[in-house]
Amino acid sequence: EIGVRLVGSEMCIRDSASTDDSVSILNHYKTNSRVAHLEINSVNTGSPFAQWQKGISLSRGKYIWIAESDDAADSSFLEKAVSVLNQYPHTSFCFLGSNCIDEKGNELSTDFDRWTSKQLRRPHNIGIFDGEDYIKHNLYWRNYIYNASGVVFRKQCFEQIKDLSCFSMRYSGDWLFWIEMARQGSVVELYEKLNLFRLHSTSTTVEGNASGNAILEDIQVVHYVESFSYPIGCYKRLMRHGMLYKNICLLYTSDAADDLI
């Protein structure tokens, strides 16, 4: 349902050869006045990030929201995110919190935000961060932006990105994308949970973690950040490399356990 409260918005809807009933649902929006583009692929691209790139290129607006089809948002989500971005014109993107739900829509206790009391005491529930600091303290360590549906970003900042290799990735492209976006300006966080993030027992992320292919892309992202001129100390680099090594060990330990079973 298209129920967000934002005047002058448009929608670009893309489907990558879904095997469920997504196509029949999307076809209902063909005549909706707010749908500027509706494109359904006959073949799955194999990468959600290639879909991102196409959708962004088609968009004509000042701000972009990548609304994943399985997720949902409060009707005030876009209104509040855009208001914050208008208030802070030097920011690249606005990141909001999400409540997690399972495949059937039941709310889960999982909390990826884990906001501190200090964060929740900020004026107007807003935190502003220098992009470089945000990378060093958050995005270097993990894909801190765990849900793309919880972000609204400036198209102008996206257009300043020189390296678009994130879109050719299968698993870690979103992580690299947010790193590139943070390099284009400050980052604003709005400490309100206005999104629903659906977790699946089977997904590209789960498959990538099980196969080990996701770790290979994670290593590429970490090394890429370390190539920046940002001063990341030797001790922190060793800690980060240790985290990658631990994930590799867990993968092989899991494989060994499966062989024993």
What residues fall within each predicted segment?
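Conserved nucleotide-sugar donor-binding catalytic segment
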Residues: 74, 96, 114-214, 218
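Glycine-rich, basic loop-to-helix element that forms the pyrophosphate-binding segment
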Residues: 1-2, 41-59, 72
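Active-site acidic Asp-centered loop
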Residues: 16, 67-69, 95
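Single conserved hydrophobic/aromatic residue that forms the stacking wall/gate
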Residues: 1-8, 13, 252-261
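Short aromatic/hydrophobic "clamp" motif used to bind/position activated sugar donors
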Residues: 64
